């Protein structure tokens, strides 16, 4: 995305986005796991506390929690560490919060936040292990695919980063 999107819609009733100044690694991991386990998100789970804390407390990293009626239901992480750019590192909702328009609002809201900084590019990496609704949502929001890569990693259910019963819709190799 090379230009700011239009204004974000109003948040759904009872839903809010708040910045975590410096989330504790274990609290962050707990929400990351709730959001990402259905899609085998594991990258933050395998970092030790010191490495994760270094990322989360970096001045170029912004972490946001999505709440509904005070309960955490999602997260967003923006990475401004590359000058002039922002990467949407993570964005997601817990399974029970999907399908009601919160994700569309969240994506628009974080895009607006990203463009408050002096950037000329806002980008996201997604993968086949993400929700099948992710790529269409990113395209609707104004992101344009620029390349495709193949990444291979050990299955986090085998390594123990996630429970063996996580993401049953994804074949275990």
Language model features with spans:
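Terminal substrate-recognition subdomain of acyl/acetyltransferases
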Residues: 1-14, 144-173
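Short amphipathic alpha-helix that is part of the acyltransferase structural core
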Residues: 11-44, 164, 171-172
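Conserved acetyl-CoA-binding loop of GNAT-fold acetyltransferases
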Residues: 115, 137-148
